[in-house]
């Protein structure tokens, strides 16, 4: 009986403890954008790779019929300023993960569009693009 009470007490402590959730905003960094050919037409089915240069971890995404891709990378607060490499076929571009480490309320990320062999980063368009994709009203 005592062993059962100890196990129940331990279970209560484990269940009641806050768990470090991987889905928390301060562990996510989202890179999204569109891949188009040089004429501006969407390139569906393209593989988009985002490499975390510090660790070599590779995150893959694919474009949909509109050429849209979304890649979510696991980056913690300590990763602000970290270098990432975005690759679509032979085209690649170095990115810097820019965010305020203390801000745990706003989504972290950037928008990157690939047009032909040209890569254009639009960090200011990230939140509006994400809100549109999620169907949320823009702030």
Q: What kind of region is each of these model predictions?
A:
Residues 54-72:
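Short, acidic Ser/Thr/Gly-rich low-complexity loop/linker segments typical of extracellular
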């Amino acid at each position: 009986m005592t062993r059962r009470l100890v196990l129940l007490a331990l279970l209560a402590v484990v269940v009641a403890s806050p768990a470090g959730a991987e889905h928390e905003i301060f562990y996510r960094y989202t890179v999204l954008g569109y891949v188009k050919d040089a004429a501006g037409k969407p390139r569906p089915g393209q593989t988009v790779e985002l490499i975390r240069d510090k660790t070599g971890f590779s995150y893959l995404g694919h474009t949909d019929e509109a050429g849209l891709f979304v890649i979510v990378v696991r980056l913690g607060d300590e990763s602000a300023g970290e270098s990432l490499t975005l690759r679509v076929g032979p085209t690649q571009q170095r990115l810097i993960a820019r965010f305020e480490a203390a801000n745990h309320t706003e989504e972290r990320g950037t928008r990157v569009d690939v047009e032909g062999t040209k890569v254009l980063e639009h960090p200011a368009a990230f939140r509006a693009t994400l809100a549109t994709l999620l169907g949320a009203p823009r702030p």
